[in-house]
């Protein structure tokens, strides 16, 4: 069983993007200075966790992917359609990412932004509890 962290999710998505678009740079932070187009930015906008029972948690993540380029609008739309296919089912070993709601996207000032909601079910293992050692006491009663 793999440990699920926010970095695991972002890395899984960036790996899928890199497989489809090997010539594009992919950033995992919001650095805008010195970026080389075309490129993607991948980051988590927000997350939420809800306890299902003592060992199971449901985690919701809203992922934002931005595509910066000098492409025309039809070319950007083509990238958007390819991303819809890629992001609808991503698998990395035991981790499977499928959106829980429709994927939304918009193009503003030539920048494609996609919003992808994922839900994961996380199983927490009980931490081993330290038990006390035996205590031998010797006493006398008077």
Annotate each PLM feature:
Residues 35-37, 60:
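Short gly/pro-enriched beta-turn/loop segments at secondary-structure junctions
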């Amino acid at each position: 069983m793999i440990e699920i962290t926010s970095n695991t999710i972002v890395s899984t998505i960036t790996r899928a993007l890199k497989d489809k678009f090997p010539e594009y740079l992919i950033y995992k932070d919001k650095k805008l200075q010195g970026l080389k187009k075309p490129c993607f930015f991948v980051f988590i906008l927000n997350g939420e966790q809800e306890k299902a029972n003592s060992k199971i948690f449901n985690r919701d993540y809203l992922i934002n992917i931005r595509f910066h380029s000098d492409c025309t609008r039809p070319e950007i739309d083509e990238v958007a359609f390819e991303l819809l296919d890629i992001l609808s089912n991503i698998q990395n070993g035991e981790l499977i990412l499928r959106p829980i709601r429709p994927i939304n996207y918009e193009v503003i000032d030539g920048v494609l932004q996609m919003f992808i909601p994922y839900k994961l079910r996380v199983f927490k293992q009980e931490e081993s509890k330290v038990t006390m050692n035996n205590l031998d006491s010797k006493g006398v009663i008077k």
